[in-house]
Amino acid sequence: MGILETITGPRDLDRLSREQMVELAAEIRQFLVAEVSKTGGHLGPNLGVVETTLAIHRVFDSPRDAIVFDTGHQSYVHKLVTGRQDFSRLREAGGLAGYPQRSESEHDIVESSHASSSLSWADGISRAFGITGQTDRHVVAVVGDGALTGGMTWEALNNISDDNTRKLIIVVNDNGRSYAPTIGGMARFLNTVRTRRTYRGLYETSQRVFGVFGAPGDSLYRGLRGGLHGFLTRVTDNEALYSNLDIKYLGPIDGHDQQAMEEALEQARDYGAPVIVHAITEKGRGYEPARRDVADQFHAVGQIDPETGEPIDPSHAVSWTSVFADEILALADEDPRIVGITAAMLRPVGLHKFAEKHPDRVHDVGIAEQHAVTSAAGLAYGGLHPVVALYATFVNRAFDQVLMDVALHRAGVTFVLDRAGVTGPDGPSHHGMWDLALLQIVPHIRLSAPRDATRLREELGEAVKVDDAPTVVRFSKGSVGDEIEAVRRLDDGVDVLHESASKDVLIVTVGPMATMGIEVAERLAAQGIGATVVDPRWVVPVPRSVVELGGTHRLVVTIEDGVVVGGIGTRIRQDLREAGIDTGVTELGLPDEFLDHGTRSQILERVGLTPQHIARDVVAQVLGSRVPSARPLPEDAERVPMRAEDDEQA
């Protein structure tokens, strides 16, 4: 039996010798490579925090001492030492979440995986401990150097420094990367700290001096190196960044030196005031395929061969992101006004090809979505057309800037929202399900949702030509799927995808839900119900022809992969009422609740967004047994009578 199998909780670490801790770290890395390669997940970040996480749990008493992980994707080691070692269904329905989750363990505090929030959480928790008299409890916030590029981190530091009586420890996990290499002035400063010759020279010289005395000298050196770190920190002025904030700084510490990390954390724990412990770590530590991966060091992987790191079943399907990557480059080649902006996710959002060919026209602003959006407004004012590429879930963080800096000023900015709708295994904070409801209320905005690769190219090209209002192009995660050709295109750009002789039901689909809408129509046809399926392409503002078609059908059904409350269906219903059209509207989408992790198909089935479920309900509405009921047929209409029992066959 290995050491890892004997660990059921953090206090089991206390009985281990230093040699056993080193052995445990090696076992954990072997476990992570073996298990995550089967399920996929955040491999590189977790390989880089093994010793740091073990040290935190040895020095502090979780859950009495609160441990908060920023973004949370580096919490696998934390899960392992807090009694969760069944990784067989990691990120799958019914299995462990890929991020901290309170329902899994009392050791998990913050579930959100959005970056730069941990210090604000730590500020609030430590204040609460003080107010309630729990002054013996510590708060430990683990934050990556990438998250330090987010402004919220510095707002929190400003407030933390205002109260020097709290037992708050900030562990900076500095691996020089967020998803990719960390950028900006903060990154340059930390890199200077890591590589400054004065620090390294003095540290290495002191090690050699003690080493002259053989084993006794080495032992003395190990005993004194915590103090040596502090001394060299002062000598080389590494704490200059934090001195004005009145927060004690310890480091930099080798984050893979278990003993050094424990000594630094013990010193921070006993200090009795806010302390920053700067740990230098290596993303992908101990796994050669990750170390060779220059792009992101296996930040997140699918199923891979653990020996080679190669995908087990490489997909040859074209992804939405790759279609965007090729098309934005083609558009930028033609139009020198187009510039790209990303928030620390150059490759994940597909701007890497643009950046490689036109490096002066693509700007990575770090994990700073608010700044990205307002900077884009400034670029538009200067005569350029910015394309801000984000994951859909992260545009939530910059809503005020979209509203007040872009829309109010009628700035021609295009937002490209990747991973829109249900994203699957990363859980509630990564589903891009709020963008439609959130953005459709912005004045002047134009919002598109392409159903396939051809429409993505079309709508992106149309978006970058709009210079007097914000535009949005949103698409899903994963592969694009087959082309869905229109039966015809109406004069306002709406595509008719399916139509029947009788106009019973108008089905309005948003983006990739077109496939589902067509299948629903086919099921209805088998029941003698005629349906028209349309893809508005540009869903906001609602095209005129969609409203007109709503008036000529007996029932309108909208299908979207965003939250249904305040979504596109709501907008269509309002426009119908304003036009004096009383056709019943059924709005289908995601419920206003946080959806757990699972595959896209599992989640859609869980919330009733399947062709079978939708068709069954629509049949009931046409029969008048379910509200909203379809408008009655005209008295002179000749139709094949339907039987109520046919409802079950839809």
Curated annotation (Swiss-Prot):
Thiamine diphosphate binds at residues 73, 113-115, 146-147, 175, 287, 369. Residues 629-650 are annotated as: Disordered. It holds the Pfam family DXP_synthase_N. It catalyses: D-glyceraldehyde 3-phosphate + pyruvate + H(+) = 1-deoxy-D-xylulose 5-phosphate + CO2. Signal peptide: none annotated. Binds 1 Mg(2+) ion per subunit. Disulfide bonds: none annotated. GO terms for biological process: 1-deoxy-D-xylulose 5-phosphate biosynthetic process; isopentenyl diphosphate biosynthetic process, methylerythritol 4-phosphate pathway; terpenoid biosynthetic process; thiamine biosynthetic process. Pathway: Metabolic intermediate biosynthesis; 1-deoxy-D-xylulose 5-phosphate biosynthesis; 1-deoxy-D-xylulose 5-phosphate from D-glyceraldehyde 3-phosphate and pyruvate: step 1/1. Mg(2+) binds at residues 145, 175. SMART domains: Transket_pyr (SM00861). Its EC number is 2.2.1.7. GO terms for molecular function: 1-deoxy-D-xylulose-5-phosphate synthase activity; magnesium ion binding; thiamine pyrophosphate binding. PROSITE patterns: TRANSKETOLASE_2. One of its GO terms (cellular component) is cytosol. Its cofactor is Mg(2+); thiamine diphosphate. Residues 633-644 have a biased composition (Basic and acidic residues). Keywords: Isoprene biosynthesis, Magnesium, Metal-binding, Thiamine biosynthesis, Thiamine pyrophosphate, Transferase. Catalyzes the acyloin condensation reaction between C atoms 2 and 3 of pyruvate and glyceraldehyde 3-phosphate to yield 1-deoxy-D-xylulose-5-phosphate (DXP). Homodimer. Belongs to the transketolase family. DXPS subfamily. This is 1-deoxy-D-xylulose-5-phosphate synthase. It comes from Clavibacter sepedonicus (Clavibacter michiganensis subsp. sepedonicus). The gene is dxs.
